[in-house]
């Protein structure tokens, strides 16, 4: 990334998450350009790093070195902004991931279903949600893809829930909105696997609200 930036023309670099910040920071410093740091999550508190203490220690040192040098920073939730302020005394502006508003169409719920939309990753409460379907008289649609999809598919088969849990795969935004609009309720559950998940404010939270579902 750093080499590409050095040989590119730009006025501002928008660095998304800590793994892009070192290259962006030093490229901006070398070329005298402006930097905006965009923290989509509390990077050093994600489960993938918490489970790898050596790797996490390296990122923590980079974070401690670079964040106090950032003068323009944004993040997705007030909780994450407050955590960074308390730890590094760096101010973050909050820009939430809210969808563009639109006029709700009348709902035609021919099939009653719950909907989970988003990444199929560890810590999203998907295993518990699937197990709960054994006792619920309703379908579960899962829209998205991710690291644990095959594991979830096997879990559904083990519980013999193939007729109640339907994997939709990745959908384009328009098609996904149709499913969200038709849902009885949206699933937005996260396991407390670290401060990043604890303070998260997922996109799906606002998508569900915008589509008028609980």
Kindly label every feature range from the protein language model.
Residues 2-9, 22, 26-30, 37, ...:
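Membrane-proximal helix-turn-helix segments that form the acceptor-binding/catalytic region
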Residues 10, 36-53, 72, 102, ...:
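A short, histidine- and acid-enriched strand-loop-helix "catalytic/donor-clamping" loop
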Residues 15-20, 39-40:
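Short His-centered aromatic/hydrophobic patch
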Residues 44, 56, 60-105, 165-167:
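Donor nucleotide-sugar binding/catalytic pocket of nucleotide-sugar-dependent glycosyltransferases
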Residues 65-68, 134, 150-151, 172-184, ...:
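Short acidic alpha-helix that forms the nucleotide-activated donor recognition element
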Residues 71, 180-199, 211-214:
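Acidic donor-binding loop of glycosyltransferase active sites
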Residues 74, 106-133, 137-141:
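Conserved donor-binding/catalytic core segment of Leloir-type glycosyltransferases
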Residues 143, 151-178, 185:
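Nucleotide-activated donor-binding/catalytic signature segment of Leloir-type glycosyltransferases, i.e.
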